[in-house]
From Swiss-Prot:
This is Large ribosomal subunit protein uL14. Pfam families: Ribosomal_L14 (PF00238). It comes from Bradyrhizobium sp. (strain ORS 278). Keywords: Ribonucleoprotein, Ribosomal protein, RNA-binding, rRNA-binding. PROSITE patterns: RIBOSOMAL_L14. GO terms for molecular function: large ribosomal subunit rRNA binding; structural constituent of ribosome. One of its GO terms (biological process) is translation. GO terms for cellular component: cytosolic large ribosomal subunit. Coiled coil: none annotated.
Length: 122
């Protein structure tokens, strides 16, 4: 579960390395975000000559969370780190590559571009 002030890794090649959640979108009092949810992030660490720079405020899709993800068949999936993919205002990924596995729950939330770029879908 991601909430305000949560630090996340960036799972794409946009140039950002670490981001911090500053808002969970979807409702006035929404507190937590999970896989597939859109959050507003501030970039805390970035590489030189990247597409984004430190201090930028952008939207991101949460792609990995440490909290258990329960599935309808009773199975549970969990990741080691919290991670997100930066998106623009048209909900398209800023980067051209995605690093690491992503869960298939993203498909239900209509993030098909992220699914197609990911090397592995769990």
């Amino acid at each position: 579960m991601i909430q305000m002030q949560t630090n996340l890794d960036v799972a794409d090649n946009s140039g950002a390395r670490r981001v911090m959640c500053i808002k969970v979108l979807g409702g006035s009092k929404r507190r937590y975000a999970t896989v597939g949810d859109i959050i507003v992030v501030s970039i805390k660490e970035a590489i030189p000559r990247g597409k984004v720079k430190k201090g930028d405020v952008m939207k991101a899709v949460v792609v990995r969370v440490r909290k258990d993800i329960r599935r309808a068949d009773g199975s549970v999936i969990r990741f080691d780190r919290n991670a997100a993919v930066l998106i623009n205002n048209q909900s398209e990924p800023v980067g051209t590559r995605i690093f690491g596995p992503v869960p298939r729950e993203l498909r239900a939330k209509n993030h098909m571009k992220i699914i197609s770029l990911a090397p592995e879908v769990l």
